[in-house]
């Protein structure tokens, strides 16, 4: 893993380059507040939790929370040094290598990790999420 290169990538990644759909905006706005331990863990890898590569939302659950099944993040360098982990937070969150992900057109060594499960309040007012 190249933690410094990963940090640089996330520092340079502007919010305007992220998906602007309501589901992604909700994720970006809420995830760090809802999951401080996961946020801190991802920071040790150089990853900014509020800048996901992919979010994968479902539909609101009975409690009015939006479940995200496997939000994904880019990590630079080789997979060597990365180990799957369980982070204790609001709920236990698994951090692991993604088995599939969208294409990214990045030409330098990197890999994709995913975290799950994530449950967030729905706070994007102008749009009602599906229940």
Regions flagged by a language model, labelled:
Residues 41-49, 79:
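Hydrophobic, Leu/Ile/Phe/Ala-enriched alpha-helical segments that form helix-helix packing faces
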Residues 22, 76, 114-116:
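Residues in well-ordered beta-strands of folded domains
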Residues 20, 51-52:
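A structural signal for short, well-ordered beta-strand segments and their strand-loop junctions
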Residues 52-110:
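Amphipathic protein-protein interaction modules
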Residues 98-131:
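Glycine-rich, aromatic-bearing surface loops/beta-hairpins
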Residues 1-44:
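N-terminal cysteine/histidine-rich coordination modules
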Residues 47-50, 57, 124:
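Mitochondrial intermembrane space
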Residues 26, 78-82, 118:
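Generic structural motif
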């Amino acid at each position: 893993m190249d933690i410094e290169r990963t940090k640089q990538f996330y520092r340079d990644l502007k919010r305007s380059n992220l998906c602007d759909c309501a589901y992604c905006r909700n994720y970006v706005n809420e995830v760090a507040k809802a999951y401080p331990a996961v946020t801190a863990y991802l920071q040790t890898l150089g990853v900014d939790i509020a800048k996901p590569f992919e979010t994968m939302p479902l539909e609101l659950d009975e409690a009015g929370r939006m479940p995200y099944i496997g939000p994904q993040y880019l990590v630079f360098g080789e997979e060597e040094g990365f180990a799957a982990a369980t982070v204790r937070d609001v709920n236990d969150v698994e951090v692991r290598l993604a088995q599939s992900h969208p294409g990214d057109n990045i030409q330098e060594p990197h890999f994709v990790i995913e975290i799950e499960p994530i449950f967030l309040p729905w706070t994007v007012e102008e749009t009602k999420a599906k229940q």
